[in-house]
């Protein structure tokens, strides 16, 4: 009964409720974490934050993963990453270096981007390597499937809707699991 009342309230505030079982990060944060982690690993490998973000904007995401880390806050990303990744997973060097110098993202005026003018100052993105968007979303796709397989989310359609509405995942795809299903048919 409590869940039904909570869902009714969420509808009243014009949001879409999605009942999920309790798990670290539930659905949205559980799938965003691996996606943002992979994006920062790519930055560690030498690609610019602008290039990483451009790849995902071109894919159809509303915002790049590096810009998202800046908005969430590097301190929050660091803490959430530890909680979601588990023991033994090292945080990306680019995150640790910025965090250790007090660059916490938009809230501190500097993170991966400089916000001293109020808006992020970005350099021109480099050439986006072929396959970069696919590499970046692969952990998100995998984690979404794991959550369905574990029964955290009741089924693939609900997971797809939750990830689209909760993260802005490129809506034209029909959601991450639909994207995998239709991509594999080609």
Describe the residue ranges of each PLM region.
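N-terminal glycine-rich phosphate-binding loop for ADP-containing cofactors
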Residues: 1-186
């Amino acid at each position: 009964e409590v869940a039904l009342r909570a869902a009714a309230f969420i509808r009243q505030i014009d949001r879409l409720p999605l009942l999920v079982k309790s798990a670290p990060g539930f659905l949205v944060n559980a799938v965003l974490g691996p996606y943002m982690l992979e994006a920062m690993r790519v930055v560690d490998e030498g690609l610019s934050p602008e290039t990483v973000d451009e790849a995902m904007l071109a894919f159809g995401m509303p915002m790049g993963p590096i810009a998202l880390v800046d908005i969430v806050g590097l301190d929050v990303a660091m803490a959430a990453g530890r909680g979601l990744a588990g023991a033994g997973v090292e945080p990306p060097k680019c995150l640790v270096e910025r965090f250790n110098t007090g660059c916490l993202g938009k809230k501190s005026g500097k993170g991966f981007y400089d916000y001293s003018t109020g808006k992020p100052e970005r350099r021109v993105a480099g050439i986006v390597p072929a396959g970069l968007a696919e590499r970046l979303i692969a952990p998100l796709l995998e984690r979404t499937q794991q959550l369905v397989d574990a029964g955290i989310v009741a089924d693939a359609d609900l997971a797809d809707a939750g990830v689209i509405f909760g993260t802005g995942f490129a809506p034209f795809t029909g959601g991450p699991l639909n994207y995998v299903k239709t991509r594999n048919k080609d």
